[in-house]
Amino acid sequence: MQCPSCQNTDSRVLESRAADGGRSVRRRRECLNCEFRFTTYERVETVPITVIKRNGNREIFSRSKLLHGLNRACEKTGLDTSRLESLVEELELRLQQRTGKEVSSTEIGEFVLRDLKQISEVAYIRFASVYRQFRGIDDFVSTLETLNADQEQNHLATVR
């Protein structure tokens, strides 16, 4: 492993432990040249997931791109970044477990919306407004009414 400080390739492992629920290994390393300490993560190499965009273009699934979009939707909502990282991790795991390695951006958006609805209504609305390309106030009102109706249904189901 190359040292990020001096680019030397000799290092020793100080500590190893499971991370991401056992899906990766976190290693604490020390460069043998400059004694700089750094952390690496090792995970199983997976078959890349291809995302089919709305316009028909295909691109490789980017967890960082999705996480960036979620961070934007969740700004100032008080949601912890680690919770969003977990959401992306869970989504990527679901996609990897599918038999086909192609997924539409629509499916990804719906997965994210379903999960966000459980975590934060504000983040759900903000993400939905971009993902569903809201054109005006009517789109917001319609989504809020649907969200409210879902809440009432869930409340009635728990009361019974």
Curated annotation (Swiss-Prot):
Zinc fingers (unnamed) by residue: 3-34
Cofactor(s), by name: Zn(2+)
Keywords of this entry: ATP-binding, DNA-binding, Metal-binding, Nucleotide-binding, Repressor, Transcription, Transcription regulation, Zinc, Zinc-finger
Listed GO biological process terms: negative regulation of DNA-templated transcription
HAMAP family in UniProt: NrdR (MF_00440)
Function: Negatively regulates transcription of bacterial ribonucleotide reductase nrd genes and operons by binding to NrdR-boxes.
Database matches in NCBIfam families: transcriptional regulator NrdR
Protein name as annotated: Transcriptional repressor NrdR
Organism: Synechococcus sp. (strain CC9605)
